[in-house]
Amino acid sequence: MSTAKTLTLEMHLGDLMIGELSFDATADTFAVHYTKDWQQSGFPLSPTIPLDGTGTSNQISMFLVNLLPENKGLDYLIESLGVSKGNTFALIRAIGLDTAGAIAFVPKGALLPETQLRPIKAEEVIQRIEDPTMWPMEIWDGKPRLSVAGVQPKLNLFYNGKEFAFAEGTLSSTHIVKFEKYHHLVINEFITMRLAKVLGMNVANVDIVHFGRYKALCVERFDRRNIPGEQRVLRRHIVDSCQALGFSVSKKYERNFGTGRDVKDIREGVSFNRLFSLAAKCRNPVAAKQDMLQWALFNLLTGNADAHGKNYSFFMTPSGMEPTPWYDLVSVDMYEDFEQQLAMAIDDEFDPNSIYAYQLAAFMDGLGLPRNLLISNLTRIARRIPQAIAEVILMLPPLDEDEASFVAHYKTQLLARCERYLGFVDEVRDVEV
């Protein structure tokens, strides 16, 4: 029972209670206790919170903080609840029914809300796009509606192929609708995601939807599956790389204090070495490393310097982790005012324009992987991209003149990057490091 000193949330997977999350308000510490049945047959919240209950308060706190929205979404949540930013327990209690992954955090003895859908109208979305100060995208019906991590304006919604709605009860969000924060960002992410799909990568399904004249990106959640006719949505548990490593969201970049002269050499965040170390916890370590390598190379070729630790995730299963489909793929190279330093260094190089055969060879040597694996993957992907990007452009909805110019520039930059890497990739085999 929760008291003023000890507060408790039940952890539910569907109809099954798998354990409890408790918070000692006096000591300011968390604890997770799994049920005996779940310890026998289930999976942990994350690798750092094992089934034997030995996860530390700090590890549990880091896991929970990574579930929270960022920037304005978090600010609105804090304002609505009247709690401090550091009150992680209160924040999780507020959004715990529909966070990333499969686990719902439910107050003890609480009844689930009635199963229902609250449809959203295009006019309501347009109002929030055009006047976000008066009508924040994150606030609906007087309460925060954003419960997924990230900084981009977005809504997590139930979608049945016809209309979008907020879901309650046994239903939950099945899609994430992302709105433009930067020039042509929706088109950019659509192209990059579909390009990965055409190349045969395991990537989330995306489409462009319209609210009046405004475009938005509709992303199908791979941790959710709607069961038509049964009034329920199945969930699958996932963790991002920060959670899997026991890192806070502040360490999603390898240079966790930024790129300033006095702090750029502090590299305590998610790096490729740390990411690849997680393959040992996967059901198929070899396949996991192959997926990680392809993700790294695809991001180099598409100019996605912002591929950080929260942009690579894993399914949690009783037999180990498994990489999820890719997501949040954007060519940030298209925006001059974006940070163009890599989120994770290739060897010790953060400047993508300074990566050559030497850096790629040292990168593979440092990971303990054969250089030929990089050569074959990079060559195959780069050679297939010209045809693949042509196919993807045909998938776009009608574009205006400015959008068409953006797409043409995207293609030119993409093909130039492919030619650049193809020009020296064979040197990776024999270069001395």
From Swiss-Prot:
Phenotype reported upon loss of the gene: 50% decrease in biofilm.
Gene3D superfamilies listed in its UniProt record: 1.10.1070.20
Keywords, comma-separated and alphabetical: ATP-binding, DNA-binding, Kinase, Nucleotide-binding, Phosphoprotein, Repressor, Serine/threonine-protein kinase, Toxin-antitoxin system, Transferase
Coiled coil: none
GO molecular function: ATP binding; DNA binding; protein serine kinase activity; protein serine/threonine kinase activity
Start-end of DNA-binding region: 380-384, 429
Active-site residue numbers: D306 (proton acceptor)
Modified residues (Phosphoserine): S147
Induction profile: Expressed in late-exponential phase; part of the hipBA operon.
GO CC, alphabetical: cytosol
Catalytic activity: L-seryl-[protein] + ATP = O-phospho-L-seryl-[protein] + ADP + H(+); L-threonyl-[protein] + ATP = O-phospho-L-threonyl-[protein] + ADP + H(+)
EC numbers: 2.7.11.1
Protein's UniProt keywords contain DNA repair: no
Family of this protein: Belongs to the HipA Ser/Thr kinase family.
NCBIfam families, per database record: couple_hipA
Subunit record text: Monomer. Forms a HipA(2)HipB(2)-DNA complex with cognate antitoxin HipB; has higher affinity for the latter when HipB is prebound to DNA and HipA is phosphorylated. Binds DNA in the ternary complex.
Record's function text: Toxic component of a type II toxin-antitoxin (TA) system; overexpression in wild-type temporarily inhibits cell growth, overexpression in a hipAB deletion leads to acute growth inhibition. The toxic effect of HipA is neutralized by its cognate antitoxin HipB. In the ternary phosphoserine-HipA-HipB-DNA complex the DNA is bent about 125 degrees; all HipA in the crystallized ternary complex is phosphorylated. In E.coli phosphorylation of HipA is thought to release HipB from the HipA-HipB-DNA complex, suggesting the complex functions differently in the 2 bacteria.
Protein name per the record: Serine/threonine-protein kinase toxin HipA
Gene it is expressed from: hipA
